[in-house]
């Protein structure tokens, strides 16, 4: 049982082409953290569309799908705007078939719906992050998720930098392989890092320096130039002694930013 990203050479990990899914229930972790308008209409479905090759391959192979994802960063247990129920209609349209929905990702309802799935059927679970155990990579929570299926597929490249229960914990309990999107992204990164064209420039953005420490430290040794963008650029500006006013800044990470600048 092995996860695609945690440990070892990613190029040697199994993909969905390496397993037989006929008649099996497959837990599929995807990244459907898509934007919505005020009426909760999806304004950009790119992340959903990019998973279709994986989902259709599994369905054509005779699998039943249990799809898991998160939306946003819920600060309360059940904020409606973060519910995956807002994805059901569009996902059904993309797949051309009915999509069942569970109002929780674990527990009696999810277990009953998952157990009753037949080959070719699809179940979408409620937001994983409604449970704090997801981000904590809680073993008991991961085991509950894994118990819904026979095998798991990780196609959520967008969250692969996080060791959460659904992507890092589940593989400890059931066999987990990479989906086509995950495989494509990892192969692209490996190819780029192994034999890059020069000059090699990396553009890294986001709000938090703390989320990118490992990436930046690793990239410093491989690239010619790193361009820092997004909110975390202000933390680096502060580290260089530049005025940033009231701009977003991780004050407790300024010393760390200084260390990274010195390393560069």
What are these regions (language model features)?
Residues 1-10:
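Short, Lys/Arg-enriched N-terminal segments with co-localized hydrophobic residues
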Residues 11-264:
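Active-site loop-to-helix "anion-binding N-cap" substructures in soluble metabolic enzymes
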């Amino acid at each position: 049982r092995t996860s695609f990203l945690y440990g070892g050479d990613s190029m040697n990990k199994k993909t969905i082409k390496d397993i037989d899914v006929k008649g099996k229930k497959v837990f599929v972790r995807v990244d459907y953290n898509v934007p919505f308008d005020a009426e909760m209409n999806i304004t950009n479905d790119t992340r959903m569309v990019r998973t279709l090759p994986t989902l259709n391959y599994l369905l054509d192979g005779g699998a039943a799908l249990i799809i898991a994802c998160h939306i946003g960063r819920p600060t309360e247990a059940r904020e409606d705007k973060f519910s995956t129920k807002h994805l059901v209609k569009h996902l059904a349209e993309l797949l051309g078939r009915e999509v069942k929905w569970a109002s929780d990702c674990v527990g009696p309802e999810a277990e009953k719906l998952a157990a009753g799935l037949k080959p070719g059927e699809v179940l979408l679970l409620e937001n994983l992050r409604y449970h704090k155990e997801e981000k904590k990579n809680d073993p008991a929570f991961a085991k509950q998720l894994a118990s819904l299926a026979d095998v798991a597929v990780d196609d959520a490249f967008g969250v692969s930098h996080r060791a959460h229960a659904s992507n890092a914990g589940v593989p400890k309990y059931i066999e987990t392989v990479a989906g086509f999107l995950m495989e494509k992204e990892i192969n692209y990164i490996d190819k780029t890092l192994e034999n890059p064209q020069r000059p090699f420039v990396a553009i890294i953005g986001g709000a938090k320096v703390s989320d990118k420490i490992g990436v930046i430290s690793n990239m410093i040794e491989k690239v010619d130039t790193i361009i820092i963008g997004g909110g975390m650029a202000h933390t680096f500006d502060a580290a260089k002694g530049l005025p940033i006013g009231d701009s977003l800044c991780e004050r407790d990470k300024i010393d760390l930013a200084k260390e990274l600048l010195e390393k560069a």
